């Protein structure tokens, strides 16, 4: 029902580790009006299937799988699963879209990436996420981009400490495996309940985009590389915040 119009991969060799970035698209490829959708931490581009289908008449909807998710490559060096690496990939993709009219839609982690992309240059130097080399490279790339709109979901200008703890707990279940799709759906309903009320069909859809079948174990497992969770341990984030003089997170 929500199958993409096109699916393809980009070979990216300009980063610390060559890899493939997989993209799903809805709508006409020649449409210069683009909506670029960025998914959450443990989700993938197929989450935007209903969204892409709805807007495909008027827009070219482009949805990448962040590296380590969906059909994109898994990195050998797990420490590279970081915001600067994701931003480089997205900028690489944007450069190939050749569009001057891009609307950014970001959910959760995707929203954080979208805010960095739309922000003024100084945000890179003000953030502990970026090294000096990251700042130089990203500011060069970012200067080429012109976004017309920014739409955020499940993220905002302030961070709630309780929500960070909940996220840390929720991602701990993501290393599980499931003997059937039904068992996986039950787990997804429980651990993604903050998504709000959904029909049985919608929960099934969200589950199918979340799991893959592992032929070796003959079980269903989350679609992503478990290594994506390691860089986001809360202690590391708190240490980073304290290193730049932030003593508390606003609620």
Language model: regions and residue ranges:
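N-terminal cap/lid segment of alpha/beta-hydrolase-fold proteins
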Residues: 1-20
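Active-site loop/oxyanion-hole signature of alpha/beta-hydrolase fold enzymes
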Residues: 16-17, 63-105, 134-138, 143
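Conserved HGGG/HGGXW glycine-rich cap/lid loop of the alpha/beta-hydrolase fold
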Residues: 22-76
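Aromatic pocket-lining residues of Rossmann-like dinucleotide-binding sites
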Residues: 55, 117-121
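Gly/Ala-rich beta-loop-alpha elbow adjacent to hydrolase catalytic centers
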Residues: 106, 110, 114
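Flexible "cap/lid" loop of the alpha/beta hydrolase fold
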Residues: 130, 135-181
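Helix-loop "lid/cap" segments that line or gate small-molecule binding pockets
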Residues: 168-174, 186-197, 209-212
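Conserved serine/cysteine hydrolase catalytic core
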Residues: 214-251
């Amino acid at each position: 029902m929500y199958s993409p119009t096109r699916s393809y991969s980009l070979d990216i060799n300009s980063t610390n580790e060559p890899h493939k970035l997989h993209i799903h698209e809805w709508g006409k490829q020649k449409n210069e009006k683009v909506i670029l959708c960025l998914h959450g931490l443990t989700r993938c581009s197929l989450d935007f299937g209903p969204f892409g289908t709805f807007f495909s008449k008027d827009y070219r909807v482009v949805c990448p799988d962040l590296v380590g998710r969906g059909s994109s490559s898994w990195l050998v060096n797990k420490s590279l699963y970081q915001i600067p690496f994701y931003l480089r990939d997205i900028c690489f993709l944007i450069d190939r879209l050749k569009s001057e009219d891009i609307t950014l839609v970001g959910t959760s982690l995707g929203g954080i990436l979208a805010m960095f992309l739309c922000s003024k240059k100084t945000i890179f130097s003000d953030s502990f996420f970026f090294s000096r080399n990251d700042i130089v490279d990203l500011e060069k790339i970012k200067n080429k981009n012109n976004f017309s709109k920014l739409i955020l979901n499940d993220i905002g200008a302030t961070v709630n400490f309780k929500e960070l703890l909940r996220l840390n707990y929720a991602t701990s279940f993501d290393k599980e495996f499931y003997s059937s799709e039904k068992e996986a759906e039950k787990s997804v309903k429980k651990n993604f309940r903050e998504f709000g009320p959904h029909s049985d069909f919608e929960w099934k859809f969200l589950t199918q985009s979340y799991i893959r079948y592992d032929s070796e174990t003959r079980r269903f497992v989350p679609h992503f590389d478990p290594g994506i969770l390691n860089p986001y341990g809360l202690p590391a984030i708190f240490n980073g915040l304290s290193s730049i003089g932030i003593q508390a997170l606003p609620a």
